[in-house]
């Protein structure tokens, strides 16, 4: 028999070359194989495999926000982020050119939605109540459209590509609208 891996439904977690990108929480991934014997070959049905996550799903306290497109993974720990009059959009200066459009559109959308002015600055670290954006994430499983958002006293967004960082702004705006200007 020859067995060939065809693919998974979550390529962000299990690549075609079988590289595993550890998810945030345990995630069920469906995989398919091609089985060949001589001139005959068959495609298997989907097999579900659980890929262990970085965090236990039991630590999630805050519910996953409902946004479109849906968040692929979520761990909601205790506490929340609240915007303030001092909130800023902080762009990693190494990616100033790549994130220029994001900064411009997020600023306009944020001001239209909240009625609050927000400044765009370039720095390597955010302050309290800031939105921080950077590229060059080491998590290659994020692919072009993925992002990792960490919420604490600031909101930090890491992406591999500017498209993923832009999608993060859309999720942020939807969550702020639903939760009276806070992010769980």
List where the protein language model places each region.
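Acidic, contiguous N-terminal accessory segments
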Residues: 52-184
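Beta-rich interaction/scaffold domains
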Residues: 1-59
């Amino acid at each position: 028999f020859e067995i060939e891996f065809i693919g998974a439904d979550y390529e962000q977690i299990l690549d075609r070359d079988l590289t595993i990108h550890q998810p945030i929480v345990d995630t069920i991934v469906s995989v398919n194989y091609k089985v060949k014997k001589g001139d005959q070959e068959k495609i298997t049905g989907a097999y579900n495999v659980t890929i262990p996550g970085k965090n236990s799903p039991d630590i999630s306290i805050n519910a996953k926000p409902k946004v479109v497109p849906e968040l692929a993974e979520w761990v909601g720990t205790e506490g929340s982020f609240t915007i303030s009059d001092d909130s800023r959009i902080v762009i990693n200066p190494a990616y100033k050119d790549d994130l220029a459009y994001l900064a411009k559109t997020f600023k306009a959308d944020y001001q239209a939605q909240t009625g609050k002015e927000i400044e765009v600055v370039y720095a390597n670290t955010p302050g309290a109540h800031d939105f921080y954006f950077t590229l060059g994430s080491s998590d290659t499983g994020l692919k072009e459209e993925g992002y990792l958002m960490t919420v604490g006293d600031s909101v930090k967004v890491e992406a591999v590509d500017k498209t993923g960082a832009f999608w993060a702004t859309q999720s942020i705006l939807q969550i702020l609208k639903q939760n009276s200007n806070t992010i769980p």
